[in-house]
Design a protein with these regions (language model features):
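Flexible "cap/lid" loop of the alpha/beta hydrolase fold
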Residues: 85, 90-135, 162-166, 170-171, ...
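Conserved serine/cysteine hydrolase catalytic core
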Residues: 160-198
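Gly/Ala-rich beta-loop-alpha elbow adjacent to hydrolase catalytic centers
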Residues: 72, 76, 80
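Helix-loop "lid/cap" segments that line or gate small-molecule binding pockets
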Residues: 136-145
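Conserved HGGG/HGGXW glycine-rich cap/lid loop of the alpha/beta-hydrolase fold
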Residues: 2-41, 61
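The conserved SAM/SAH-binding core of class I Rossmann-like methyltransferase domains
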Residues: 34, 97, 185
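Active-site loop/oxyanion-hole signature of alpha/beta-hydrolase fold enzymes
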Residues: 30-69, 82-86, 109-114
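Short beta-strand immediately N-terminal to the catalytic nucleophile in serine-hydrolase-like folds
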Residues: 70-72, 97
């Protein structure tokens, strides 16, 4: 039996893992899927990357977790790297599932330069420095393998994403010295996060 902590990507909350979590629990595993600070309905969206990371570190501490397989998807990859720096002794393995793996001193926007302008425009227009892309902008990128009906259902669970965590440059020097085992999963039909040439 393993203990999994599943960390969602942008615009989501922990409920996006419900089906995966149920499958893992049916296999006898313990599964947690916390929501990153600033995400989810009714969240305080005035957060930066450090606050987001702290929310997951605090979850680990409050739940007294250890021996964890920590999985991060997309933006969640930037969170699990910093959680690993803070609590490496609690981890059995890190899994980057179609996730951003930043270099030291990078921010998420450095890996998605094509998205910066329209995201920043949306954040300025929002009044609270968040961005929720319109459905038609994301249909063929995030929901490219499902029916329109399912795509609309999935999109209906999205909430505005705080953008400051995308801007924050991360000090990852410690991360690259950790001896925590790491796995990198790349789903080939996920076209949102291309496989880096490194």
């Amino acid at each position: 039996m393993l203990t999994f902590v599943l960390i969602h990507g942008a615009w989501h909350d922990g409920s996006c893992w419900d089906e995966v979590a149920a499958h893992l629990r049916n296999g006898g595993h313990v599964v947690h899927a916390p929501t990153i600070a600033g995400n989810g309905r009714n969240a305080d969206r005035r957060v930066d990357h450090a606050v987001c990371t702290k929310s997951i570190v605090d979850f680990f501490v409050s739940q007294e977790l250890g021996g964890v397989v920590l999985v991060g998807h997309s933006y969640g990859g930037t969170i699990i790297a910093k959680v690993a720096e803070a609590e490496p002794q609690r981890l059995r393995r890190l899994v980057f599932f179609n996730a951003f793996v930043l270099n030291d001193s990078q921010c998420l926007f450095d890996e998605t330069p094509q998205n910066v302008d329209h995201t920043e425009r949306g954040a300025r227009a929002s009044g609270d420095d968040t961005f929720l892309p319109p459905f038609d902008m994301v249909r063929d990128v995030f929901f490219n393998t499902v029916s329109r009906e399912d795509a609309l259902r999935f999109y209906g669970n999205w909430t505005p994403q705080p953008i400051q965590p995308f801007r924050d440059k991360l000090d990852l020097k410690k991360f690259f010295t950790l001896d925590v085992p790491k796995s990198y999963l790349h789903a080939t039909e996920d076209i949102r996060v291309p496989m880096p040439e490194r």
